[in-house]
Design a protein with these regions (language model features):
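DUTPase catalytic domain/fold
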Residues: 1-147
Length: 147
């Protein structure tokens, strides 16, 4: 496993820095920097109070926390949320309450998402007249079976 250094800035000095729940986890826990309530099917942009400087060649992906998704119906609208290497603004999370009947209450400091940082290559596209043939072909959207 390789290590990289990422500079992080607290935009609010009371914010807890992201950390891994377990040493081998892929995602760093992001916390809400505000109290809020999401009504059923409501979307909300939630502040984290943090900004990061990702190295060139890396991107951040903001993902839902599985426990919140299954237990409360809390998810992220644009999952994964993409953080480009040169973005320096505040990290915010677009949450949605998918529970049809219950409000979801979020307190400042609650873990609301996870940040996965991955190396991403620069891709050189080459336009061609035909693509190589494969067994799968253009099969997608359930072509390999539903379950």
């Amino acid at each position: 496993m390789s290590n990289i250094t990422v500079n992080i800035k607290r935009l609010d000095p009371t914010v807890e820095l992201p950390k891994y729940a377990h040493p081998t986890d892929a995602g760093l826990d992001l916390r809400a920097n505000e109290d809020c309530t999401l009504k059923p099917f409501e979307r909300r942009l939630v502040s984290t109070g943090l900004a990061v400087a990702l190295p060139d060649g890396y991107a951040g992906f903001v993902q839902p926390r599985s426990g919140l998704a299954i237990k409360q119906g809390l998810s992220i609208v644009n999952t994964p949320g993409l953080i480009d290497a040169h973005y320096r603004g505040e990290l915010k999370v677009i949450l949605i309450n998918l529970d049809p009947t219950n409000d979801i209450h979020i307190n400042k400091g609650d873990r609301i998402a996870q940040l996965v940082i991955q190396e991403v290559p620069t891709v050189n596209l080459i336009e061609v007249d035909e693509l190589d043939k494969t067994d799968r072909g253009n099969g997608g959207f359930g072509s390999s079976g539903v379950l």
